[in-house]
């Protein structure tokens, strides 16, 4: 079940389920639970960490410190959509990474103003 949001988004971007399955079979796309990243060194890859607003500072550090040479990492998330009771808008891993790396040229931060799901989803994230 935890794979479904990622698979849904990749299927949308690729246009069909067959393309996603083909890339996964060829090892071009890997989807992995955070539990299995410990101890790894990920080199020459493009890593996307989705829903990073729900991660703790420790989890973000665990992920970023696995990044090897030639790898780019993207953290995505919306601090208005936190559903982890152990973090909030200021204590979550995404906010921590943004704040910690803002003075370094090796990192960048982009804030999108418009939600992608729907007007209702955007409103709900603000008012609920």
Predicted regions and their residues:
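Conserved helicase motor core of SF1/SF2 NTP-dependent helicases
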Residues: 1-46, 54-128
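Walker B catalytic carboxylates
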Residues: 50
């Amino acid at each position: 079940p935890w794979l479904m949001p990622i698979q849904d988004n990749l299927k949308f971007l690729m246009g069909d389920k067959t393309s996603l399955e083909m890339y996964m079979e060829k090892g071009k796309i890997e989807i992995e639970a955070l539990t299995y990243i410990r101890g790894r060194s990920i080199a020459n890859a493009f890593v996307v960490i989705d829903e990073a607003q729900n991660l703790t500072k420790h989890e973000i550090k665990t992920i970023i410190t696995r990044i090897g040479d030639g790898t780019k990492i993207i953290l995505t998330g919306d601090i208005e959509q936190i559903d982890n009771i152990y973090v909030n808008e200021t204590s979550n891993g995404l906010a921590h990474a943004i704040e910690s790396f803002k003075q370094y040229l090796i990192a960048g931060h982009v804030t999108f103003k418009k939600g992608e799901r729907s007007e209702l989803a955007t409103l709900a994230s603000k008012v609920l």
